[in-house]
């Protein structure tokens, strides 16, 4: 079972870095212009961690932290 994570959409600035790094896990919502998690199993933990580290506003978080 994949470790769950989420995007804090209040903080997201729609830079799309997470989508570029892990397109299987993240997508952009065109209506609100924010990133969201489309599939928690769509990327490896390493890819998710890279997306977290690359996010300029640090709005991607593990659900259990």
UniProtKB/Swiss-Prot annotation:
Residues 3-31 form the 4Fe-4S ferredoxin-type domain. The keyword Transcription does not apply. Binds 1 [4Fe-4S] cluster. InterPro entries: 3Fe4S_ferredoxin, 4Fe4S_Fe-S-bd, ET_Ferredoxin. [4Fe-4S] cluster binds at residues 12, 15, 18, 55. Its cofactor is [4Fe-4S] cluster. One of its GO terms (molecular function) is 4 iron, 4 sulfur cluster binding. The keyword 4Fe-4S applies. Ferredoxins are iron-sulfur proteins that transfer electrons in a wide variety of metabolic reactions. Homodimer. This is Ferredoxin-1.
